[in-house]
């Protein structure tokens, strides 16, 4: 990384600073070291200003802190020989600051944003896989982790802090990444974590109930997602026209690519479009015949379910909009791999088919069950729970959906966190018409084991809620546990 100094970094906002060299940029006083730039933001959980003395004691070269008001914006002070710069609206400016610090990494790769309630992980993975098959060196950032394909490192949040995002992108560019697919959460948009990124394209998958414990209601949740197109450098816009919100947004995005598998496209009204003409589901996945403003074709997909057809079409439309040839995309489509913990199928002779999925919202659970039904000759089982310390309103909704779409429902723990597990289960049962027919088993490993052992060989067992996760949060403890590993062990296969 080239040399960085305080004067050049803050030149757009503040004059008269020393050209003091900066080693690294951090929001965390615990890792701040000699020569670093410490940014003391007022966060949602902590106030970085409280840790300025600690950062100074650890030898930081400079500090940027939230200004109290416009009058103090750009003010420069000194504490124990360390320059302290005051900036107003620091959280809003942080992405731009970090972008300058890390030499604008989003301008040095082809970066695609994917937002929506469901489908972000699968769509980003498909984009990264497909682009790499076409010669790019591709990376992903999101729920599963960050990194080059095959070298992904797990992360805590879908979208990291504004500094983390720019830092990771810079690291990926340094490793040779030429293409990146990034999940962008509603939290990340509202908290300005991707505000200064230059996206080559931005994809909207769908919108359904989630995160209302944070946003309050669906209107605010939608407004958060819309920020990607209204206030960010979004590049090409690719929008799911099968989603009600997506159809509304298309009216405000005349240059967007409309994507549909349900016929919600009028080629005379949309300049660029892609739609499924016919989809055949089978035990290996699906055969998809499509038409588009770029041409038509047929794809053999190894992914399960209608919503994954939608995810694949969104990825295809994005790559077409970015200029990748349709002929090359069709040649490589059959080599796309299913995504870890996203409708991931485990099979063994004489055993039920087990599907592990991350579905943890009402809409995602319904779609996962509908997808599993397409591949089920016997009974459809559903093993699921709901996370503690999160939106309680979705629990009875998910209970009702499981009861409607599955033949046998097993309600268990998800990540109970600091809530009483039985209280969460009772919230789920409250949404069911006949809760007496539901099997309740609080230990998740026991519930999964019981379901797989009791299911017949022509049954399908959907284990929903945790997907790729290899832990369970009980109280404040993070315990080792994986639905994937549990299912694979019981079937005698490798996860």
Curated annotation (Swiss-Prot):
Tell me which InterPro entries the record gives: Mur-like_cat_sf (IPR036565), Mur_ligase_C (IPR004101), Mur_ligase_C_dom_sf (IPR036615), Mur_ligase_cen (IPR013221), Mur_ligase_N (IPR000713), MurE/MurF_N (IPR035911), UDP-N-AcMur-Glu-dNH2Pim_ligase (IPR005761)
Q: Which gene encodes it?
A: murE
User: Looking at the keywords, is Cytoplasm present?
Assistant: yes
What does the UniProt function comment say about this protein? Catalyzes the addition of meso-diaminopimelic acid to the nucleotide precursor UDP-N-acetylmuramoyl-L-alanyl-D-glutamate (UMAG) in the biosynthesis of bacterial cell-wall peptidoglycan.
Residue(s) carrying N6-carboxylysine: 225
Q: Which residues form a coiled coil?
A: none
**Which cofactors go with this protein?**
Mg(2+)
A Gene Ontology biological process in which this protein takes part is: cell wall organization
Kindly list the positions annotated as binding ATP. Answer: 116-122
UniProtKB keywords: ATP-binding, Cell cycle, Cell division, Cell shape, Cell wall biogenesis/degradation, Cytoplasm, Ligase, Magnesium, Nucleotide-binding, Peptidoglycan synthesis
User: Where does this protein come from, organism-wise?
Assistant: Salmonella paratyphi A (strain ATCC 9150 / SARB42)
PANTHER family named among the record's database cross-references = MUR LIGASE FAMILY MEMBER, UDP-N-ACETYLMURAMOYL-L-ALANYL-D-GLUTAMATE--2,6-DIAMINOPIMELATE LIGASE MURE HOMOLOG, CHLOROPLASTIC
Q: Please state what the protein is called.
A: UDP-N-acetylmuramoyl-L-alanyl-D-glutamate--2,6-diaminopimelate ligase
């Amino acid at each position: 990384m080239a040399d960085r100094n305080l004067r050049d970094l803050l030149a757009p906002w503040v004059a008269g600073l020393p050209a003091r060299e900066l080693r690294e940029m951090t929001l965390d006083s615990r890792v701040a070291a000699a020569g670093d730039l410490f940014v003391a933001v007022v966060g949602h959980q902590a106030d970085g200003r409280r840790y300025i003395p600690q950062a100074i004691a650890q030898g930081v070269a400079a500090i940027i802190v939230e200004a109290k008001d416009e009058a103090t914006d750009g003010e420069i002070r000194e504490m124990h020989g360390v320059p302290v710069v005051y900036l107003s609206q620091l959280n809003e400016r942080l992405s731009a600051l970090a972008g300058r610090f890390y030499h604008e990494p989003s301008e040095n790769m082809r970066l695609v944003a994917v937002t929506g309630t469901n489908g972000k992980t699968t769509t980003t993975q498909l984009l990264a896989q497909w682009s790499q098959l076409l010669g790019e060196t591709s990376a992903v950032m999101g729920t599963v982790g960050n990194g080059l394909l095959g070298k992904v490192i797990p992360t805590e949040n879908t979208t990291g802090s504004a500094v983390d995002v720019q830092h990771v992108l810079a690291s990926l560019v340094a490793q040779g990444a030429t293409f990146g697919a990034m999940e962008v959460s509603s939290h990340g948009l509202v908290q300005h974590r991707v505000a200064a990124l230059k996206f080559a394209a931005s994809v909207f998958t769908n919108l359904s109930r989630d995160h209302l414990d944070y946003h309050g209601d669906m209107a605010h949740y939608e407004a958060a997602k819309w920020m990607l197109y209204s206030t960010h450098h979004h590049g090409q816009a690719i929008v799911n026209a099968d989603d009600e919100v997506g159809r509304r947004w298309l009216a405000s995005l005349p240059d967007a690519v409309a994507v549909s598998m349900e016929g919600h496209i009028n080629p005379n009204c949309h300049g660029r479009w892609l739609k499924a003409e016919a989809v055949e589901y089978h035990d290996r996945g699906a055969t998809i015949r499509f038409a588009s403003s770029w041409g038509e074709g047929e794809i053999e997909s190894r992914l399960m379910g209608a919503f994954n057809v939608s995810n694949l079409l969104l990825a295809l439309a994005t790559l077409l909009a970015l200029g990748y040839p349709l002929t090359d995309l069709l040649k490589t489509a059959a080599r796309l791999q299913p995504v870890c913990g996203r409708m991931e199928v485990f099979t063994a002779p004489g055993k039920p088919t087990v599907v592990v999925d991350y579905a943890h919202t009402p809409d995602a659970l319904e779609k996962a069950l509908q997808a599993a039904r397409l591949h089920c000759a016997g009974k459809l089982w559903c093993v699921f729970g709901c996370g503690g310390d999160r939106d309680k309103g979705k629990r009875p909704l998910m209970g009702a959906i499981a009861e409607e779409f599955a033949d046998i429902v097993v309600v268990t723990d998800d990540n109970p966190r600091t809530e009483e597990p039985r209280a969460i289960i009772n919230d789920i049962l409250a949404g069911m018409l006949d809760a007496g027919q539901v099997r309740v088993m609080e230990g998740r490993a026991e519930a999964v084991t019981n379901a797989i052992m009791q299911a017949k060989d022509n049954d399908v067992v959907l284990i929903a809620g945790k997907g790729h996760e290899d832990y369970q949060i009980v109280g404040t403890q993070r315990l080792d546990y994986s639905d994937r590993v549990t299912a694979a062990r019981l079937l005698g296969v490798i996860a």
